[in-house]
Amino acid sequence: MAVAINSIFLISILLFCDIKYEVSDDFVMSAIMSGAYGDKPNPHLIFINILWGYLLQPFYYILPQISWYLIFQLALCFFSLTMISYMMLQKLDRVMAIMVIVLLVTAFGSDAYILVQFTKTAILAVMGGGIVFVWSLFEKRPLKLQLLTGTLCLLGTWIRFDVIYIAGGFLLLILVIEFFRLFRSNRNIKKHIIRIICSGGILLVVVVGCKLWDIHAYNKDSDYKFFREYSQARGDIVDASDYGYEAYEEQLRKIDVSENDYLMMRKWNFADNQFFSLERMKKTAQIIADYKRTVELSKEALLEQIQTRGIQGYPICIACIVLTVLGITIQKNKYGIRLSVWIVGFIYIIYFFYIERVVYRIEYAIFLASFCCILYFFEEYKGKSKEDVYVFNYRYGIIILLCLILQCVLYLPDRSYQEIDEQSRKEYIETFFYESWNYNPCNYRKVANKGAKSIGILNEIEQHKDKLYLLDFQTTMQVLYYEWNPFNALPKGAFNNMLYFAGITTNFPECNQILSNYKAEQPLKALVQENVYLVDSDERTLDQKVKYLQEHYYPKARAEIYKEIDGYQIWKLYKK
């Protein structure tokens, strides 16, 4: 039944909803995996363990037209939800189990399926595999189930290792409570405890071992090692809070970073390894971090930020509240456990607000982990009478019906895309999808894979392979990737004459090779070359680039518009 429920749900999503990547990171990694940068599938997936890349690689050789990167993420979400569903069907009576499964798949499953994002996929696999793995150990379930769920948990850490720091807090809470229960039981538990510790220990060792293998795989290649180090420094700058150049001016001046240089870093325009060297990027990141430690964030300001974020209105938060109320109603003697789960979840939320790393995918991870933890402690309701059981089953039915009605709303796609043409396509995407780090309920119904597309700019690039096109991050990174259907793999070498000016692929070895092919190893300086063009529709970032060239290389540098296609402006820069 677990397979049947989740199959029906996934098929309905595939038939009626517009599946897309929530953030551009997934698109870039799928492009790398397909061989768009270079001439063959590449398992170096930046944020994802290289072992996952090796797992996908054979499929790209067998059927290179299909985006196996997306298919495998959808499959992992499906198996994770199915495992949780299986556990609940084993623990609860059928009506109650179906109710919590429907609540799970409508609140969390639709989110993970429609807006695919690797962090959400990872937390689903780690928590789904983790709680069923723990349950199977304590309940002495078949070894096959333990191996299956342990593997699921492991694959989740391959997708995004860092989710274990969120999942770990909730899984630790489950373990503490389970061991406490075990010690309170008057049974011979020594062998059972040893078996649990050994099984969990083996899984933990394998997880850490795979992470170490990933680190080794990058470190053994000097180019990939440099890429990882540069990416770390880049992330420490662009992901940090921005208090303005004035806050760091004194220290930045000491390392010869002007206000425009600083803005270039912040606006993802650090495409010059000579000036934006690894050493200077690290020093800049350290200056920002040092200043951050001197800034005090009051409790009132922190709570106000949480309130204005509107977390309490997220469907995933409401689902956790509904599950908590149900749990307290059914099992009044276990309200302490549910309170503990909420405390752990709130601590995580406060922590991420404190470090100012507030994005929806992290909030999703926290609420999913909370939901799974609350779900784990649900037990079959044994009413005092048949009438009592009937009343609760009636309530479950109401919840199931409400969830299904709300789910059906997602199956009614927004048709505003039909009014969009090639010229207004860019504005349409920017309006609804640009702020991918925030929750927007419209995005689940908005359609990006149908209707008119801005293929004019892509055709221009494709038809001029002798030219190198550098795409400004602010202009293209958050919008242009919607022009490709996520189910289709990009052809090998598709990006061999177009690169993001600076972004998560900066100093990626295959990208550096493309730059080398056009003798543009320093992209900023190379903008004045005859065969290098800039796609930039933001006057502010364009002016920053021109000013950078004037400050560092060409005092009389200037930019002229070359073409404008579908709202994308192509510029040619000159020395004078």
Over which residues does each language-model region extend?
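Extracytoplasmic loop-helix module adjacent to an early transmembrane segment
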Residues: 6-45, 56-61
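Short hydrophobic/aromatic helix or loop-helix immediately within or flanking a transmembrane segment
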Residues: 42-76
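Transmembrane-helix motifs of polytopic, lipid-linked glycan transferases
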Residues: 75-92, 321-329
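Short hydrophobic alpha-helices at membrane interfaces in multi-pass membrane enzymes
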Residues: 94-99, 135-154, 194-195, 392-397
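Membrane-interface alpha helices of multi-pass inner-membrane proteins
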Residues: 145-163, 172, 200-209
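Perimembrane helix-loop-helix junctions
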Residues: 166-204
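Signature aromatic-anchored transmembrane alpha helix within multi-pass, membrane-resident enzymes
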Residues: 191-204, 382-416
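Membrane-embedded, lumen/periplasm-facing catalytic core of multi-pass transferases
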Residues: 210-251, 407-502
